[in-house]
Amino acid sequence: YQLLLLIAMISFFGVDRIPFYLKVEVTRKLSFISIVVVTIAITLFLIFAYRSNMRLANFTEIYDLREENSDITSSGINGYFIFWQAKVFYPLLFIMGVLGKRKVVVWLSVVGFVLLYMMTGQKGILLTPLFVFSFYCLLKWSIKVRLDLYKLLVCMITLFSILILCIQGTPIGFAICALFFMRTMCICGSLFVLYVDFFQNNPFTYYSHISIVNKITGMYPYDDVLGKVVTDGGMNANALFWTTDGVASCGYWGVFIISIILVLYLFLLNSIERLNTNNIFVYIVFVPSMTAILNSSLFTYFISHGVFLLIMILLFVKIPTNLKPIKCR
């Protein structure tokens, strides 16, 4: 597994250096008005679905709100709509409002995020506009001063890590250390080891852990979700795609196959970015959904988090050309 992961990670970070592009240009595209109409329609649908219990809860009440609305979120297509609005449609409108300097569009999309928060109690959804705008400002500043953003982020993370290690003996330092190092960086590695040990003596899923595959094949060999099965019910944490779609699916071959799929996806992203006259738009629009790739199945990332939908929009919908043209290269 170590050798496979080494090759996979080298491929992951080296894709951008390979001058290979997929032919994805589409000549006839839909009007962007269609996206606005779909966004409004889904918003009205969700407001109707959650109409009995929507409120602007403070951070001490959000878990109660989540529990109260859990049945609504998990029923039918509601959960997908929540993710698609939070990861695709509202960010798309927000970014276009920022780049096109349209304050009305920006504030309407922010209202959309607030409505989603009132339905789900998810703090991440409420903070998405701030996170996206901060990334936009950082990217714009790095272009202005001609600084490599990747190197800047590496330096910032390194300095932040050193700072945390210096104050880890304090209560605040311990809390930040547990959140940053353990929850953000170490859980994926710990779960990978657990999955490797578990599937040495238990049957692989052969991708039947994916809901749609299991509905077609009925091959899923366990009675509960993978996160609970592997840990014997002790936890239910989402694992990295190399773990769920790799080790759990079919061992070594699973890691190899999902790595190939990931590389093809990255080639597709590079091809889409190359066709767009404003590649900063392409970079930022993937930010909300990109965070999900760190702790979920790649197929969940594509479908539930709306990445496949976002790619289809970039390929088949005419993005307005009056956005402020900023090129990163």
Which residues are covered by each model-predicted region?
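Internal alpha-helical transmembrane segments
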Residues: 97, 104-130, 134-171
